């Protein structure tokens, strides 16, 4: 192959891009609806819940990290974090050696809320989970999404995937199931 020559056709690229776009949009519509229904009783929106979750799993983070790992603009991360601070779920701070960045930590009240939400998670009310259940029943496990993870690693970087994996490991290691509810060990 000559330098600058592409090993794919424009048609192939268009079909792949459109497939990903359509599937992502359809999947997001279900994810968004399920997520909103889950957190609605606690007067949270998706960004607020995501920020609480990231702050919990990272044991504190800068606003820039929240934006990066929450896949949101820095101003969105800051504004929603501010609302969570006003409600007593987060605290803001600056580090002595880094006055430029604003850091957040989840408060006890914020952690209690997040843990209550985790306890209240009901897989029966999650359409994506239910859509994948047949695959689990057939193959004995849920899809691992390795191709999707590889694509996201190429877009957002390895540290994005590491944080994503760390949050799942935290749930695996620090939570147990009691009476069909997820509770902290």
From Swiss-Prot:
Record-linked HAMAP family: HTH_type_Hpr
Keyword set includes Secreted: no
Domain HTH marR-type, chain residue ranges per copy: 13-157
Classification via NCBIfam families: PRK13777.1 (NF010349)
Pfam family for this entry, one: MarR
Task of the protein: Negative regulator of protease production and sporulation.
SUPFAM superfamilies: Winged helix' DNA-binding domain (SSF46785)
Full protein name: HTH-type transcriptional regulator Hpr
Gene that encodes it: hpr
Species of the source: Bacillus mycoides (strain KBAB4)
């Amino acid at each position: 192959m000559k330098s600058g020559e592409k090993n794919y056709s424009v048609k192939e690229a268009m079909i792949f891009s459109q497939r990903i776009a359509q599937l992502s949009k359809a999947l997001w519509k279900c994810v968004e609806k399920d997520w909103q229904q889950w957190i609605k009783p606690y007067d949270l929106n998706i960004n607020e819940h995501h920020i609480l979750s990231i702050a919990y799993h990272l044991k504190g983070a800068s606003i820039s990290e929240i934006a990066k790992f929450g896949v949101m603009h820095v101003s969105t991360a800051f504004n929603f974090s501010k609302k969570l601070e006003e409600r007593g779920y987060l605290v803001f701070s600056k580090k002595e050696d880094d006055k430029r960045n604003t850091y957040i930590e989840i408060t006890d009240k914020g952690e209690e809320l997040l843990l209550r939400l985790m306890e209240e998670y009901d897989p029966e009310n999650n359409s994506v989970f239910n859509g994948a259940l047949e695959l689990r029943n057939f193959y004995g496990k849920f899809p691992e999404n390795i191709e999707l993870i590889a694509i996201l690693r190429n877009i957002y970087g390895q540290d994005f995937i590491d944080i994503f994996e760390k949050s799942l490991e935290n749930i695996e290691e620090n939570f147990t199931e009691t009476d069909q509810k997820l509770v902290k060990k």
